[in-house]
């Protein structure tokens, strides 16, 4: 028999963006909130806004990798990338970016909030249940005013709103290169064009669903 010796080749390096101190704090604080709120699930992500690097990512419920078979299979699900939810008022920052870029508003644009607004047959109220009255654009952001953001969304219109949804990557995986990443759920543009209520609710963070990583 002949023998052939093949010299080993050094493997490639794998460098994580995770910061172990930030990861430890994130895990600790998420567990604390998860227990206090008696939540069914929770996720937290810490990102470097300059580079997009993920400094920490945690999900609850979780499991011990050394004894994974002693935990429900569902505990191995990474809710930070696997699950979609309505983002709520955090989406107002995205809507703000759209409107400022398109110059449909500026910091001093005026809005009036009587506490609710009628869109088609639906009535949309502000979360605090009270009227904010006359506000600048900066103030509707500060107050997270639903009525104000309904108007911002409607002023943008379907075409421009969807242009930016696509540009921001909503409705598609981010490409984080982790298994099982969901793409979220976006109302079809053709559907949104049929009634103002779709755009009105999207502008304040409802109707569409996103993943925490998005």
Protein language model regions, located:
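Conserved, well-ordered alpha-helix/loop/beta-strand core segments that scaffold catalytic motifs
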Residues: 2-42
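Beta-lactam-recognizing serine transpeptidase/beta-lactamase-like catalytic domain environment
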Residues: 2-5, 18, 44, 49-89, ...
